[in-house]
Amino acid sequence: MALPILLDCDPGHDDAIAIVLALASPELDVKAITSSAGNQTPEKTLRNVLRMLTLLNRTDIPVAGGAVKPLMRELIIADNVHGESGLDGPALPEPAFAPQNCTAVELMAKTLRESAEPITIVSTGPQTNVALLLNSHPELHSKIARIVIMGGAMGLGNWTPAAEFNIYVDPEAAEIVFQSGIPVVMAGLDVTHRAQIHVEDTERFRAIGNPVSTIVAELLDFFLEYHKDEKWGFVGAPLHDPCTIAWLLKPELFTTVERWVGVETQGKYTQGMTVVDYYYLTGNKPNATVMVDVDRQGFVDLLADRLKFYA
């Protein structure tokens, strides 16, 4: 039986590819997709969800737009990474359908309420919508199987020296998620920076030759440009968000540890840092499954295999 999931995202090139991977996988049943502000403004990320679902001919999936800003801060966007539209590069279709006439939190709550079994929430942007859901609907916590997030890092940040972008945008929301008591799975930079797509991988995807694999290759062409900066030391581009979906499909590709994670919301230099108690120094019980490594080739092979679904 397919695993029911709710996807909360801020497309974004890697979010878009996470959507492609999820909808090519019969093991997953995507119940709804909600958008968050992050990689671009809330209007643009919502539009990008609709554009991707139009491309994939999945206009049956309910979509709703989420919070327009973080819980307690002004919005920061990553237009330097994802371009003016949030999905610069390929020519994507205009949306062929409209979002639901409700908020992301309302759609999430309705989906959880109507489900006969607990649902996994996959969140690949800032955690604002998920935190609002948890705070406003404590009665639905038992309907959430787990929350799989792309965010954070045990080691180095990518937006500040200490902080990964998604967590930095709304650290208060991330702290609510980690301390919620619901099982959390964290795909942080420690693993996503190992999930790099090389130029030859992009050409492999392009050679699959269907419209969706071609769009994915064109998304990666654009995404690779930002990551060519020598400061990163990358061979290719880290495909952050699809790690969440890949873990659900093939957890054996990933090495994980069970640890306590907290989020720094106050620090002068460390605001947005995910503090991972790797050596059990705090005495706190683990609250997260933290990904620390990935079989890169297996990850690439999974993506290539699933792109053939769109032939």
Curated annotation (Swiss-Prot):
<comment type="similarity">
    <text>Belongs to the IUNH family. RihA subfamily.</text>
</comment>
<dbReference type="GO" id="GO:0005829">
    <property type="term" value="C:cytosol"/>
</dbReference>
<dbReference type="Pfam" id="PF01156">
    <property type="entry name" value="IU_nuc_hydro"/>
</dbReference>
<dbReference type="InterPro" id="IPR015910">
    <property type="entry name" value="I/U_nuclsd_hydro_CS"/>
</dbReference>
<dbReference type="InterPro" id="IPR036452">
    <property type="entry name" value="Ribo_hydro-like"/>
</dbReference>
<dbReference type="GO" id="GO:0008477">
    <property type="term" value="F:purine nucleosidase activity"/>
</dbReference>
<feature type="active site">
    <location>
        <position position="240"/>
    </location>
</feature>
<dbReference type="GO" id="GO:0045437">
    <property type="term" value="F:uridine nucleosidase activity"/>
</dbReference>
<dbReference type="GO" id="GO:0015949">
    <property type="term" value="P:nucleobase-containing small molecule interconversion"/>
</dbReference>
<dbReference type="GO" id="GO:0006206">
    <property type="term" value="P:pyrimidine nucleobase metabolic process"/>
</dbReference>
<comment type="function">
    <text>Hydrolyzes with equal efficiency cytidine or uridine to ribose and cytosine or uracil, respectively.</text>
</comment>
<protein>
    <recommendedName>
        <fullName>Pyrimidine-specific ribonucleoside hydrolase RihA</fullName>
        <ecNumber>3.2.-.-</ecNumber>
    </recommendedName>
</protein>
<dbReference type="GO" id="GO:0006152">
    <property type="term" value="P:purine nucleoside catabolic process"/>
</dbReference>
<dbReference type="InterPro" id="IPR023186">
    <property type="entry name" value="IUNH"/>
</dbReference>
<keyword id="KW-0378">Hydrolase</keyword>
<dbReference type="InterPro" id="IPR001910">
    <property type="entry name" value="Inosine/uridine_hydrolase_dom"/>
</dbReference>
<keyword id="KW-0326">Glycosidase</keyword>
<dbReference type="InterPro" id="IPR022975">
    <property type="entry name" value="Pyrim_hydro_RihA"/>
</dbReference>
